[in-house]
Design a protein with these regions (language model features):
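Short loop/turn segments immediately following the C-termini of beta-strands
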Residues: 74-77, 123-125, 131, 170-173, ...
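Surface loop/turn motifs at the tips and blade-to-blade linkers of beta-strand repeat domains
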Residues: 50-55, 95-103, 147-151, 213-219, ...
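Beta-propeller blade signature
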Residues: 82-89, 131-134, 181-203, 244-261, ...
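Repeated scaffold domains used in trafficking and secretory/extracellular systems
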Residues: 56-63, 103-110, 150-160, 219-226, ...
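Loop/turn-rich, solvent-exposed surfaces of beta-rich toroidal or solenoidal domains
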Residues: 215-265, 278
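Conserved blade-ending motifs and adjacent loop-strand segments that build the rim/top face
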Residues: 257-291
Length: 323
């Protein structure tokens, strides 16, 4: 009996010690975060909470529609494509289906809107929806896209302003390989393997031409892309490594072209020669959008798939100033 009591006391003390160690580690990591990500931590502002982040949703795409209305694209654990509409802090889920009524699959890496047109970047295609229909739909509504457009990139993310939509691809060696014709080494010696293609939009927000006006050569690990005037912004991340928010001034003309379905398209690039600033951020950054003079960014680290972000309160969309 005495042995059992001693064993119980030992285990209790051991448990207390382990909890104390874990608490100290957690506090230490929080403190380190303030130092490692000092610029980000000092200038970031919370925007809104990611929908269903603790209920299986893995957020990827992000779009600010107006005021407190946002669109989110992503997937659930079984790779089921998911779409959320968030208005004034209240979210509803729309379930994308194909023309047969079957659940669509994919990561839904980007989402953007122009007038009444909503575009989701998914598996080399743009899924086109009506914004007014999404806003009017009930929670849990199954909805097929109005149109599916094949594009020249892997369509990992997208961004639209009033006149153009940019559709880009994610690249990492040996894991997410893409068309070798998208490779380009810039004059500064930067080796690129991915493209962001710019398509014209009609006045009503629809795609005016299925051939891009031009393509932009970019580095790998790009999860999100946004443009404000002549400032181009990339969200880059992979795994538990720190994410980066990268700012570039203007586009550089390569003087070359890239082949898109037999059509020669002008090739521009973003590289170290027009890079202005890099902001270090916590891991798992995803899509971007522009709201006023700030860029907003979503993170997937707090979802149930990765968990780690739950320890650091990473369930929010964050904004950072464009300077």
């Amino acid at each position: 009996m005495k042995v059992l009591k001693k064993l119980g006391a030992f285990l209790l003390h051991l448990l207390f010690f382990l909890v104390l160690v874990l608490l100290l580690v957690w506090v230490g990591l929080l403190a380190a975060k303030l130092i490692v990500y000092s610029d980000y931590m000092e200038n970031k502002e919370p925007v809104c909470t990611l929908p269903d982040i603790h209920k299986g949703f893995v957020p990827q795409g992000l779009d600010h529609v107006a005021d407190e209305t946002y669109l989110f694209s992503g997937y659930h654990g079984n790779n089921m494509l998911s779409l959320y509409v968030s208005q004034d802090g209240v979210s509803k889920q729309i379930l994308p289906v194909n023309e047969k009524g079957e659940d669509m699959v994919g990561h839904g890496g980007g989402i953007t809107s122009a007038k009444d047109y909503v575009y989701i970047a998914n598996n080399g295609r743009l899924l086109v929806y009506s914004l007014s229909e999404l806003l009017a739909a009930e929670d849990g509504t199954k909805m097929a896209p109005r149109q599916v457009i094949r594009v020249d990139t892997e369509a990992s993310f997208c961004f639209a302003d009033e006149t153009h939509i940019y559709v880009g691809e994610f690249y990492i060696a040996d894991k997410y390989e893409i068309d070798l014709s998208h490779s380009y080494t810039t004059p500064a010696g930067d080796e690129h393997r991915a493209l962001v293609s710019c398509y014209p939009l009609a006045e009503d927000g629809s795609l005016a031409d299925e051939f891009p006006l031009y393509s932009i050569s970019v580095t790998g690990l790009v999860q999100g892309f946004a443009v404000k005037g002549d400032t181009f912004i990339l969200s880059r991340s992979w795994g538990l490594n720190s994410s980066t928010l990268e700012f570039y001034k203007g586009l550089k003309n390569s003087g070359k072209t890239v082949d898109v379905s037999g059509m020669a398209v002008p090739l521009y690039y973003l590289d170290s020669s027009n890079h202005e600033k890099t902001v270090k951020m916590p891991a798992f950054s995803e899509d971007l959008d522009i709201v006023g003079d700030r860029v907003i960014v979503s993170f997937e680290s707090a979802c149930n798939k990765y968990i780690v972000g739950k320890l650091f309160f990473a369930d929010q969309v964050i904004s950072y100033p464009i300077k």
